Amino acid sequence: MDLEHPTPIRPEEHASFDANRMGKSTLFQSERLLVGLNAFEPGQEHRLHAHAGLDKVYHVLAGSGLFLLEGREVPMTAGTLLVAPAEVPHGIRNTGSTRLLVLAILAPSP
């Protein structure tokens, strides 16, 4: 997404839902930062994965589910902020009956 700054962004307007897999949208990217949007239909999951040298912050915008982190399952609802440090396996599962929308911020940018 090409933006002029300052530009207000309404993440939900850029959500890309897919019936077959988690939807992903990039809202902003520079050499230092990536701001993305993950969109989950009920039952969808972003399997455990890790990022070498990148910290990741998730902010739940809508819906509910589970944050998977090092063998733990942490409940998440709208307004929850979660951190996945570099090299730590993490994932997300939509366990709710509605769509789950999660802002994902990675630094530095991949």
Listing of model-derived features with the role each one plays in the protein:
Residues M1-G36, R47:
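A short, N-terminal "cap"/entry segment at the start of jelly-roll beta-barrel domains
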Residues E31-L33, E41-E45, S64, P108-P110:
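Short, charged/polar surface micro-motifs in flexible loops or helix N-caps
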Residues L34, L66-L68, G91, L101:
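General beta-strand recognition
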